[in-house]
């Protein structure tokens, strides 16, 4: 779940998720900090070469994430010249933006998308976005099968509706 956003991940391609909660907690990004302080998580995904996405592409991806249940989808673009561009930069320092870049393993020319919310929702949204990007960027070799044997799965899962483990 933490790496792929799903308990049935497609492991034929990368684009693993990463945690930037500790970095965001040190920032001025109050909305996300409040989410983290109330038991939420923040996970990101690095899209190689994504700095080339148009504003319309980013808006469409944001709408897709919202259709999956996200309240918002934040992004940081790391331009080819090494500069970062994002509305998020009003709330994070240049050092924090660089720390996020390093955590993601991002390079100049990449874009990072991230979501903060309750863990189950974040994993669902990011897992679905991961599959979307895998298909959109043609990263999935459909002729290849990559079986995965899950051995450490949770026996019970918390249900918000029931208010108990099920």
Model-derived segments and spans:
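Class II aminoacyl-tRNA synthetase catalytic cores and aaRS-like
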Residues: 1-166
